[in-house]
Amino acid sequence: MCAQQGVSLYRRYLNAGIMEEGLVSPRTQGVPQGSPLSPLLSNVMLTELDWEIESRGLSHVRYADDCNIYVKSEKAAQRVLNSITQYVEGELKLRVNRDKSGTFRPKDSTFLGYTFSKADSKRIVVAEKSMKRLWTKLHKMFNSARGTSLKKTIERLTPVLRGWRNYYRLDTRKQFWNEMDERIRHHLRELIWIAWKRPKTRAQNLIKLGLDLETAWKSSVNGRGAWWNSGQAHMNLTIKNARFARLGLYSLRFMAIC
């Protein structure tokens, strides 16, 4: 696509109407939030900002209108923030959102779901907010999976886990991904324990899966909750990791980029 075709496509998109209750009304200003045109227009408008930052010898990263600039001290950060704000508003005639702008230590900032490790400032890792969003989604999936077959539950988990892992592939902490895998399997074992319902059924299934008679019965009537039991030896020894792997559970530790 040549430049003229690109400009023509942008203009057609900007002039497109807005669908409201089945009717198209004209758009007088702005771009639909979340549309693919937003980051493209941001790049058109902010390429000069990239050049300005690079001409000052500063390290930076930008996605659409979200930009981080890295300097060596808090004093330098404040100076750069002020001068870049003046440049954007004075030269580019754009407004800087001061509520979202500021100076931060790298380990306290988040960019596109990543942050810097507190233990190793040169390593980028998954941000805490990103983790919380994922587990909120997974908890809803696990709660709605009660009464559903294990295979079906794993099939529903797979695209979520694969997509999340591929996006956060720059986080290379082996222990972190191992712990994530373990926690997911813990939830799946909990679903199995809940599905067995009665102590007698639990004991019978544990025995079928290789646990000795005495341990199986003691485990089935211990009076503890499903989450506690699903993390104990009687479940880890009988519901092995290999079983989940055979059913197609996606491993965050041993990722395959798709």
Model-derived segments and spans:
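A glycine-rich phosphate-binding loop feature that marks nucleotide/adenosyl-phosphate handling sites
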Residues: S101-S109, R156-V160, W177-R185, K200-L209
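Conserved polymerase palm-domain catalytic core
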Residues: M1-D108
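Extended C-terminal regions of large enzymes
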Residues: H187, W196-C258
